[in-house]
C-alpha cells in the first residue's frame, strides 16, 4: 500500500535555525557572555605552567542544558524527530608564541568529544606545534554530529584540548591560542568526509617593512633632524647652517626612478610624507 501520510519540512522537523525560542537561547546576552568566559570563543587563552592542560567545551553547560531541554520538549510531544544534535563544520585556532624561539617546548592541540572519558582526539584531529614553528593556524573538522545528551555528569559536546609540553624554566605564558567556531543545532544528523587536521605555518609580521623603504627612511631621518632642539655652539667668524635638509639629502639613499616625461619638480614626490608605523 502506498504511503498515505504527510512529511514535515526540514523547518518543521526543526533544524530550528528559524526558531525564535532557540535564537533567544543561543544569542541572549547571558549566552554570549558564557560562550566567551567558559569557552574562550574568540578570546586569547594563555598557556601557563599552572594550566598545562586546557579543556574548552564548544558549548557552555548552561546553554547546553537549555538547548537540550528545547529539543527534548519538542521530541516528547512529537514535533521534533530527535533530541537534538550539535554540528561544528570547522574549528580554527590561531596560535602565537610569547617567548623566544630558543625556548624548548611544544603544544598539542586536538578536538575531543566530552562523551569519551579518555578525551581521545576525534578521528586523528590532532596537531603538534613546536615553539619555533609559531605562529600558526590550526583547523579541525569533526566527521559526525554530536548528540545533545548527558553522559554521567558530563554535558556531551565537542571540546578543544590544549596540552603544553616542555618549556623547562618558563612558568609564565609561553603561547597564546585564540579559537573560533560556529556551532549549529538540528534535529537531524549526518556523517562527513574525513579531512585531516590542518596546520599552516604563518610568517611572522615584519613591522619594520615600511621603514626599510628608502623614501621612508629618508623622511624619518629628516623629520628627526629637523625636530632636534639643542644648544648652538658657534665658532668664531663661522656661520652655522641650521637647516638639516642638506644633511638628510646627503644620505646614500636612492630615490625611486622618475616617471618618463615627468618634470624636475616631480623629484619631490619621492619625499612626500609617509606613515611609518604611525609616525
UniProtKB/Swiss-Prot annotation:
Residues 254-268 have a biased composition (Low complexity). It comes from Cucumber mosaic virus (strain FT) (CMV). Belongs to the cucumovirus movement protein family. It is found in: Host cell junction, Host plasmodesma. Transports viral genome to neighboring plant cells directly through plasmosdesmata, without any budding. The movement protein allows efficient cell to cell propagation, by bypassing the host cell wall barrier. Acts by forming a tubular structure at the host plasmodesmata, enlarging it enough to allow free passage of virion capsids. GO terms for cellular component: host cell plasmodesma. Transmembrane segments: none annotated. Residues 247-279 are annotated as: Disordered. This is Movement protein.
Amino acid at each position: 500500500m502506498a504511503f498515505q501520510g504527510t512529511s514535515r519540512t526540514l523547518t518543521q522537523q526543526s533544524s530550528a535555525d528559524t526558531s525564535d525560542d532557540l535564537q533567544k537561547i543561543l544569542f541572549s546576552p547571558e549566552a554570549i557572555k558564557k560562550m566567551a568566559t567558559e569557552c574562550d570563543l574568540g578570546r586569547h587563552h594563555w598557556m601557563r605552567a599552572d594550566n598545562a592542560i586546557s579543556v574548552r567545551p564548544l558549548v557552555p553547560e548552561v546553554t547546553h542544558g537549555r538547548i537540550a531541554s528545547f529539543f527534548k520538549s519538542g521530541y516528547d510531544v512529537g514535533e521534533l524527530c530527535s533530541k537534538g544534535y550539535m554540528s561544528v563544520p570547522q574549528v580554527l585556532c590561531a596560535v602565537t608564541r610569547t617567548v623566544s624561539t630558543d625556548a624548548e617546548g611544544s603544544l598539542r592541540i586536538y578536538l575531543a568529544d566530552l562523551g569519551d572519558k579518555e578525551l581521545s582526539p576525534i578521528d586523528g584531529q590532532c596537531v603538534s606545534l613546536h615553539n619555533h614553528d609559531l605562529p600558526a593556524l590550526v583547523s579541525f573538522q569533526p566527521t559526525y554530529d554530536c548528540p545533545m545528551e548527558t553522559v554521567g555528569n558530563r554535558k556531551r559536546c565537542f571540546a578543544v584540548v590544549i596540552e603544553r609540553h616542555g618549556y623547562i624554566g618558563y612558568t609564565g605564558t609561553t603561547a597564546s591560542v585564540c579559537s573560533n567556531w560556529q556551532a549549529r543545532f538540528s534535529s537531524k544528523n549526518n556523517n562527513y568526509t574525513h579531512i585531516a587536521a590542518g596546520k599552516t605555518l604563518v610568517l611572522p609580521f615584519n613591522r619594520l617593512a615600511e621603514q626599510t623603504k628608502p623614501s621612508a627612511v629618508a623622511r624619518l631621518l629628516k623629520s628627526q633632524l629637523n625636530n632636534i632642539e639643542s644648544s648652538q655652539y658657534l665658532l668664531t667668524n663661522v656661520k652655522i647652517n641650521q637647516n638639516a635638509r642638506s644633511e638628510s639629502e646627503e644620505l646614500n639613499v636612492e630615490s625611486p626612478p622618475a616617471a618618463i616625461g615627468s618634470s624636475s619638480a616631480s623629484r619631490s614626490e619621492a619625499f612626500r610624507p609617509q606613515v611609518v608605523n604611525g609616525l
